[in-house]
Amino acid sequence: MLSRALVIALCLTIPSAGPDQKTSAKKSLEGVWKIVEIVTTGVDAATITSPQPSLAIFTKGHYSVLSVNGAEQRAQFAPPKDPNNLTDAEKIARYEQWSRFTANAGTYEVKGATLTRRPLVAKNETVMARNSSLASEFKLDGNTLWVTTKSEAGQPASETRTKLKRIE
């Protein structure tokens, strides 16, 4: 009789463990994070231990990521001589500053160790127009989050491991 009760208890408990773990991982992902290190292997290999400002926010099912890419501050530029008619040099200066900035937001889903983001709005039109998701592996350890992204099929092989620290 005891073994039958134990089997029934296990059957009732084990199926509910999966969703609770998923919910737990998703809840611990919720918060505000900043990038503290970026390591890229393969094409354009680099390690950035003092990244520029960033902010990643995860709520119940939505995310927003803003970051200045690279190890160097973005160059400042002088105000335009004629704001309605920028010179080629003024346009290039603005492009150089703007191209190093990442901004996108949308929905996300967690399945096991996979974080899948679906951008709804982005600075780069291509990111939101591609109608596909951005899948990364992730690992949480207390207030540290690692997100590992591999290059897409057809692109030169590389892997970027981004380390984030919880700030809220």
Question: Could you say what each language-model-derived stretch is?
Answer:
Residues 1-8:
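Sec-dependent signal peptide recognition
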Residues 11, 15-168:
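Lipid interaction determinants
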